[in-house]
Amino acid sequence: ADSKMDGPRPCTILAVNPEKVIRAQQDRTLLEQLRTADLLIPDGIGVILAMRLLGLGQAERVPGSELMPKLCGRAVAKGYSVFLFGASAEVNQQAVAALQRRYPGIQIVGSHHGYVKEDEMPSVISLINECQPDLLFVALGSPHQELWMSRYLPQLQVKVCQGVGGTFDVLAGHVRRAPKI
């Protein structure tokens, strides 16, 4: 993430699982978002096995719910600011509180729930830009977050944007992480 902080456009980080690969075969917008993402992280044993079968190396599973906390730790160390967008208002605020407890000194400059009507989106985009976050975490679930990023990222003034699926629910304690296999 450090190398992307001074880039000319936002860096996008997306997790790829078998369900997303299958859906992208029918959804051109999702496929394009996956093709143009700066970093695709393998989130699922099916993707890992496919990569190995295709001779694409010995990748390891990197769930978005594990990468986001690592980026938050880096944000504290480097002074990067963070914005959380998505989930319900309650879960969003609980995720903010959980990150503040886990990472003292984290600069969470704003947050907004993900239940936004289309006509309200310009004000959400304005809010995110006014807060000037370095890192934007989008928790709308897949493929909604990827499609949202495809549509709105060009209007945002963020440096790194990661789709994090249900990670806010995990941080808030509403959902347990899947066990490691």
What are these regions (language model features)?
Residues 1-66:
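N-terminal nucleotide/polyanion-binding subdomain common to many enzyme families
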Residues 10, 80, 156-159:
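A short helix->loop->beta-strand "cap" motif at the edges of active sites that frequently abuts
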Residues 17-21, 140-145, 167:
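Short glycine-rich anion-binding loops that position phosphate/pyrophosphate groups of nucleotides
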Residues 28, 32-36, 146-166:
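A short, gly/pro- and small-residue-rich
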Residues 38, 109, 134, 159:
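Conserved acidic residues
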Residues 48-127, 131:
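Conserved beta-alpha
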Residues 113-119, 159-181:
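Short, flexible loop segments at boundaries between secondary-structure elements
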Residues 128-142, 158:
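Proline-aspartate-enriched helix->loop->beta-strand connector
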